[in-house]
Design a protein with these regions (language model features):
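Catalytic strand-loop-helix junctions within cyclic-nucleotide turnover domains
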Residues: 28-37, 56-60, 66-87, 113-115
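Bacterial c-di-GMP phosphodiesterase EAL domain
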Residues: 30, 138-141
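Catalytic-core segments of nucleotide cyclases and related cyclic-nucleotide turnover enzymes
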Residues: 38, 72-103, 107, 117-137
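A structural micro-motif at secondary-structure boundaries
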Residues: 62-64, 140-141
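A short pre-motif secondary-structure segment
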Residues: 16-19
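A short glycine-centered flexible hinge/capping loop motif at secondary-structure junctions
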Residues: 21-22, 58, 102-103
Length: 141
């Protein structure tokens, strides 16, 4: 409850914080400039690092978190290319990249110079981060 409250206090009133399960949360930011994503991620990372989570009986704990973020639509010139669920899959790829490359960081993924042209390209985009980066479908930002 403390972590979700910290997230809700970090976002704007119209934004939505959802628990996906376990320790994963989804924040939906409405009408947001992609540059704001990285600012918000930095703010959340700082707040989590400095927050004393109350364990009861006088004990506290400091935590860190990892963040994966993407704008939606991911491809502004092709807003229907990915479904909302596929956008979440791409954000999940970013999250796992952050977790597997040091934790306590945010990884942002943006549209790359080569938008996917075929359905199998879209499938690769949402399941294989390395291939999506190599083929220019995505870029880290």
């Amino acid at each position: 409850m403390q972590f979700s409250a910290l997230l809700r206090q970090s976002v704007r009133q119209d934004d939505v914080v959802l628990r996906l399960g376990g320790e994963e949360f989804l924040i939906v930011l409405k009408n947001t400039d992609p540059a704001y994503l990285t600012l918000l991620a930095a703010k959340i990372l700082d707040r989590v690092r400095s927050f004393d989570f109350d364990l009861g009986e006088g004990f506290t704990l400091r935590k860190t978190c990892s963040i994966g973020l993407v704008p939606f639509p991911l491809f502004p010139d092709k807003p229907d290319l990915l479904s909302f669920e596929q956008g979440i899959q791409v954000a999940d790829l970013a999250l796992y990249h952050a977790k597997h490359h040091g934790r306590d960081q945010a990884v942002a993924l943006f549209a790359g110079p080569n938008g996917p042209a075929q359905d199998e390209d879209v499938q690769r985009l949402v399941t294989d981060l390395g291939a999506a980066l190599d083929q220019g479908f995505l870029r880290m930002g």
